[in-house]
A protein has these predicted regions:
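A fold-level detector for beta-propeller and closely related beta-sheet-rich head/sensor domains
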Residues: 1-303
């Protein structure tokens, strides 16, 4: 078990109620964990974690991942917007990826195996080896959480930057940064980290419940030992996916070219060792992370 990424904190100054977030990975089976610990004002770290993402991702975490309550998004490059991951068989690049077998062969569109592989990526264990029709890679017996190696978690609480309300830029009535800070004050804290299970994960900072999984569409690849299909390869060695540390800032931007500019908290994610891609998510309000197509299009800004 190892840890390569640095720790993160829920506040810029150590105070009562502060949390420390640590990541781990196990190179024996490439499982991972994100843990939250209470942090005392004197800097003492609790010996027992408040929560563990690995435990949240236990066997009974998912019912039927393709239809249940897990919120997962991806990017449809052709449409130019975010979509629900469970609907990604309708995206050209991802479907081609799901159809690739370890030997490099591909199957016809809309095959049962592509559907099964998507369900596997979303957490289903029904097709894991040895007792399955497809013998996909068996993940850690206790959890499907993948390794987090270089991605340092980032905590997002209340907006706390100091953008001025005055200046040369006309924000318009009700669009001042001070208005945004007031409106977003008290929003639920969330912690974000990239995983080599293919997704950037968002967790409720207090409970560890997963709020969102984002599978970047640009990571789709039909090459061997690459792409999302490789995660299900029974001979999987290791591959990096969302390996970069997410960064977050408040920006006065449009959600789309046709939309209106507004203050938003924007997360920029990257692949690091996993590739050369970037993506942006609107993380202003975690309560917007819902399993609807409209929310997927709203939250995912671009890749």
């Amino acid at each position: 078990i190892g840890a390569a990424a640095g720790a993160s904190f829920s506040s810029s100054a150590i105070e009562a109620g502060s949390l420390l977030f640590l990541t781990q990975f196990n190179s024996a089976d490439w499982s991972g964990d994100l843990l939250a610990f209470d942090l005392a004002e004197d800097g003492t770290v609790a010996t027992v974690a408040n929560w563990s993402a690995k435990e949240q991702f236990s066997d009974d975490y998912f019912d039927d991942p393709t239809t249940a309550t897990r919120v997962a998004y991806t990017w449809d490059a052709l449409a130019g917007n975010g979509v629900l991951m469970k609907n990604s068989l309708g995206t050209t690049d991802l479907l081609a990826d799901y159809q690739v077998d370890p030997d490099g062969s591909s199957e016809a569109p809309a095959t049962d195996k592509a559907t099964a592989r998507l369900s596997y990526l979303l957490g289903s264990r029904t097709q894991e080896a040895p007792a399955s029709a497809y013998d996909f890679r068996a993940r850690n017996a206790d959890s499907i959480m993948g390794d987090i190696v270089h991605s340092k978690p980032v905590y997002i609480g209340d907006p706390n930057l100091n953008w001025p309300d005055d200046g040369d830029f006309d924000y318009g009535a009700g669009n001042l940064y001070s208005d945004f800070k007031s409106a977003a004050a008290g929003r639920a804290g969330a912690v974000y980290a990239g995983g080599n299970d293919g997704a950037l994960h968002a967790f409720d900072a207090d409970t560890g419940t997963e709020l969102l999984a984002y599978f970047p569409g640009h990571l789709a690849n039909t090459a061997g030992a690459s792409g999302y299909h490789y995660l299900s390869d029974p001979d999987y060695g290791h591959h990096y996916y969302v390996d970069g540390s997410p960064v977050v800032g408040d920006a006065f931007v449009k959600a789309s070219t046709a939309g209106s500019a507004a203050w938003r908290s924007v997360l920029i994610g990257s692949d690091r060792a996993g590739g050369r891609g970037l993506f942006a998510l609107d993380v202003t309000d975690p309560s917007n992370f819902l399993g609807t197509s409209s929310k997927a299009a709203q939250v995912v800004l671009w890749e």
